[in-house]
């Protein structure tokens, strides 16, 4: 059964187990998926409201975009765990002869590169979610300000959690060019995503405090 098909209780029990996977990477993807789901919710709560009739098309489009992000982030949960299992298998390869050592080293290198892709994808998806949220500031149902804020925090957690996974995987690579490229890509997403998250959270905190 894929991780996204588990119950909430079942998934948290898997995380809490002694097994190293699923772990932080899949949890980061789930955090992002929750943020995307809340974005879809906030957009949905804006639809059909006379007060927001001028932004109905925007809300409908945002709802669809957020739900698409949610599904892709749920898929990333499984992808992260599967690539981790791949590199774990590489570390378990025999290393008695020079040939075995070379084969093991090569498999580990390829496995670590593969492990870098899901968290980078999660960062990209969370960045898209934060961009979508920012476009909705002041245009969604005001009664859902706290939900909007939690969406922002969840997407931020997903992005920064995935970044930690990018860093730990690239830190073990011998291919420094690949590692530098992956880190540069992740840093670029942080540089645009985190200020967006700060703006969205500050506005929602102010909105909630005014009530």
Predicted regions located by residue number:
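Amphipathic alpha-helical interface segments
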Residues: 80, 84-153, 157, 169
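Long, charge-rich low-complexity segments
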Residues: 79-94, 197-211
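A structural-propensity feature for long, helix-poor, extended segments
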Residues: 50-89, 189
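Preference for long, well-ordered alpha-helical segments
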Residues: 122, 129-132, 144-204, 210-211
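Short, hydrophobic/aliphatic alpha-helical segments
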Residues: 3-22
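Amphipathic alpha-helix face/heptad-repeat signature
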Residues: 30-34, 62, 69-76, 111, ...
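Transmembrane signal-anchor/signal-peptide helices with a preference for the extracytoplasmic
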Residues: 41-53
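Conserved phosphate/anionic-ligand binding catalytic regions in large, soluble enzymes, centered on
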Residues: 17-40, 144-162
């Amino acid at each position: 059964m894929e991780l996204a098909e588990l119950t909430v209780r079942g998934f948290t029990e898997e995380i809490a187990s002694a097994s190293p996977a699923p772990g932080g990477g899949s949890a980061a993807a789930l955090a992002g998926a929750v943020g995307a789901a809340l974005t879809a919710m906030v957009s949905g709560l804006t639809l059909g409201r006379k007060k927001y009739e001028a932004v109905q098309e925007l809300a409908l489009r945002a709802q669809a975009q957020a739900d698409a992000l949610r599904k892709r982030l749920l898929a990333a949960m499984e992808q992260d765990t599967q690539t981790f299992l791949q590199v774990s298998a590489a570390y378990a390869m025999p290393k008695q002869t020079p040939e075995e050592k070379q084969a093991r080293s090569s498999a580990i290198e390829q496995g670590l590169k593969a492990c870098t892709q899901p968290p980078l994808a999660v960062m990209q998806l969370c960045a898209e979610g934060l961009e979508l949220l920012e476009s909705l500031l002041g245009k969604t149902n005001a009664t859902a300000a706290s939900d909007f804020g939690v969406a922002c925090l969840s997407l931020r957690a997903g992005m920064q959690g995935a970044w930690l996974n990018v860093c730990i995987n690239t830190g073990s690579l011998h291919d420094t060019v690949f590692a530098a490229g992956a880190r540069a890509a992740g840093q670029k997403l942080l540089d645009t995503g985190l200020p967006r998250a700060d703006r969205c959270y500050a506005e929602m905190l102010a909105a909630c405090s005014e009530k």
